[in-house]
Curated annotation (Swiss-Prot):
Protein name: 6,7-dimethyl-8-ribityllumazine synthase
Record organism: Polaromonas sp. (strain JS666 / ATCC BAA-500)
Pathway: Cofactor biosynthesis; riboflavin biosynthesis; riboflavin from 2-hydroxy-3-oxobutyl phosphate and 5-amino-6-(D-ribitylamino)uracil: step 1/2
Residues reported to bind 5-amino-6-(D-ribitylamino)uracil: F26, A60, L61, E62, C84, I85, I86, N117
NCBIfam families associated with the record: lumazine-synth
Upper taxonomic lineage: Bacteria, Pseudomonadati, Pseudomonadota, Betaproteobacteria, Burkholderiales
Function field: Catalyzes the formation of 6,7-dimethyl-8-ribityllumazine by condensation of 5-amino-6-(D-ribitylamino)uracil with 3,4-dihydroxy-2-butanone 4-phosphate. This is the penultimate step in the biosynthesis of riboflavin.
C-alpha cells in the first residue's frame, strides 16, 4: 500500500508447521476478514487445516494472554495476532495499540517464537476495511517465513 516495497523471498513452504492464530473479536467484521484471508493464505502455503489452531478473545489487549498460553504449550512453530483498533476520541486508542503491540513483541522475544502481528491500527473503519485482506495474507506469509528461518537457524 502507498508504494511500500515488501521485498521478496523464496517460495514459502508451511507443510511441516503448526500455527496458532489469536483473533480479537472487537471490530469483528474486520477481524473475521483478516482471519479468513490469513487461513486461506496458510492453506496456500501448505499448512494443513489440522495444524492451525484458531481462537478468539474479546479485544486486542487480551490477544497477548492467549498468545502466551499458546507459546507455553510448545505446540506451535509460529503464532499470528489478529485485531483491529480504530482511533476514537480518547487516549484509549494509544493505550490499546501501544500495550498490545509491545506485549506481542515481548512474547516473540521471550519465547523465541515468531509472532506475526496483524493487529491493525487505523484512523477509521474504511482504512481497516481497505487493509483487512492483504494484512491477513501478510500475517500468514510472515509466520511461515519466520518459522522457516528460525528452523534453519536452530
Amino acid at each position: 500500500m502507498f508504494g511500500a516495497e515488501k521485498g521478496s523471498t523464496d517460495k514459502l513452504d508451511g507443510r511441516k508447521f503448526s500455527i496458532g492464530i489469536v483473533q480479537a473479536r472487537f471490530n469483528e467484521s474486520v477481524t473475521n476478514a483478516l482471519a479468513e484471508a490469513c487461513k486461506q493464505e496458510l492453506a496456500a502455503l501448505g499448512v494443513e487445516e489440522k495444524n492451525i489452531k484458531h481462537v478468539k478473545v474479546p479485544g486486542a489487549l487480551e490477544v497477548p494472554c492467549a498468545l502466551q498460553a499458546m507459546a507455553e504449550s510448545d505446540k506451535y512453530d509460529a503464532l499470528i495476532a489478529l485485531g483491529c483498533i480504530i482511533r476514537g476520541e480518547t487516549y484509549h486508542f494509544e493505550l490499546v495499540a501501544n500495550e498490545s503491540g509491545s506485549a506481542v513483541t515481548r512474547l516473540a522475544l521471550d519465547y523465541q517464537l515468531p509472532i506475526a502481528n496483524a493487529i491493525l491500527t487505523t484512523e477509521n473503519l474504511a482504512q481497516a476495511e481497505a487493509r483487512q485482506i492483504e494484512k491477513g495474507r501478510d500475517a500468514a506469509r510472515v509466520a511461515v517465513e519466520m518459522a522457516n528461518l528460525l528452523d534453519e537457524l536452530a
